[in-house]
Amino acid sequence: MPSSATSTYLLSLKQVSLTASSPLLLQLKDRFFHQPKLLNMGFSTGKRKSRDEEEDRVSFFASEFPMDDLNDDVLERVLSWLPTSCFFRMSSVCKRWKSSQTSKSFKLACSQIPTRDPWFFMIDNDSNSSSFVFDSTENSWKNLNRRDFLHHHRQDFIPVASSGGLLCYRCSISGDFLLRNPLTGSSRDIPSQDNNNNKPLQAVAMTTTTVTPSSYTLVTISGEIPNLSFKIYESNADSWSKDQELESVKNNDSSLHDDYDTDSGTVYFLSKQGNVVVASNNLQRSPSKQYSSVITVTDEAEIVYFLSSYGTIVACDLTKRCFTELPKLLPPFLEYSIDLVECEGTMYVILLSEFFESASLRIWRLDNNREWVQVGMLPPALSHELYGKKGDINCVGGAGNKILVCFNASPPEVYCRYFVYDLVAEEWNELPKCFKDGEAVDFVSALSFQPRIEATV
């Protein structure tokens, strides 16, 4: 077995040893896995420990605990802890491992893994042709390149949401939805919603459960403020709920939208070129983020957040059936790009702005006092490189408190950068360029999913 594959196998044995009652597995933790953890703060340099040291440790361990000695039950539990990419590589050369892909007990073991490092499904300008993902475990690009990834008659389907191990697509013509596991290729059409009185769709959100059997929920927000409503699709019932109205709740620090509904609400400001400009309330969204939203689920409430057409953050409480607009972070006369993400049940705002001849990219969250608190900032040396590019940011939150920021500037100068921020380690990483047939591939946005073989539609 290659040393790198064996090393990953050892890590999966470590995970099993932490939960198993087998004396053989329990002793693994004590004998081989007391390693100090190092944390790099700031911008990651990606340093690794000595290859010789790792290979010596792996060779010794493999001779002590050969895999052939593991029974099927223990083997499947070990395999379930493997990173998904490693499992696919290793199962391709071992019939015994390959057969586990269809095993119900193996899928059950996989479903009991609390979380997996996220994969980022990248979306280019031609949203329905995307097939590249970034594997955050191995820090590498992968081309799913499945001939059946989306059938030719489904080229009008655009990725709009994700949760767990599933991606959600929406047909730009009919409005129908399609759920898909990008790893296995399994898919399912979602029945059409009943007539929604031609209300414009504002947002699509999705949640999943990893328990067996797995289930998922789709939420759609429709209408125009202040007349919003929502519908919920439950996979267990295979049906949509009735259209439910959302009541508007006003706050003293609520959005500036009301001020701009009056004739006297127009704001003028002086641009850098010395021209008088009218502040616009019209938010320009990337087509790939047209229905983008995030959903947070707690014991008290389910809340869907999305950006309104005039740039405010709308919070829709599905439990109380009401919505409110959150206070803006910046006044309308400042040019900026904004997006929302969710990590571990918390909504974050990513904001790119230019001020005093420099660019600033910051991450914010709303505290209990409804005040914005900064939780992260791209190092100034990097953010300054984005200055003057007139670019847009599209972001997504992933499992493990990771946030991907896609920066892209439109022609005449195409300029794309991709940054990942770890909220826990407070560490930024820039993703390498992605290449196909020797040419760089550019992306405008992404969706985050966990690579779960067991996720069913």
UniProtKB/Swiss-Prot annotation:
Superkingdom of the source species: Eukaryota
Segments forming domain F-box: 64-110
Coiled-coil parts of chain: none
Signal peptide: none
PANTHER family in the record: BNACNNG10540D PROTEIN (PTHR31672), F-BOX DOMAIN-CONTAINING PROTEIN (PTHR31672:SF7)
Name this protein carries in UniProt: F-box only protein 13
Species of the source: Arabidopsis thaliana (Mouse-ear cress)
Gene name linked to the record: FBX13
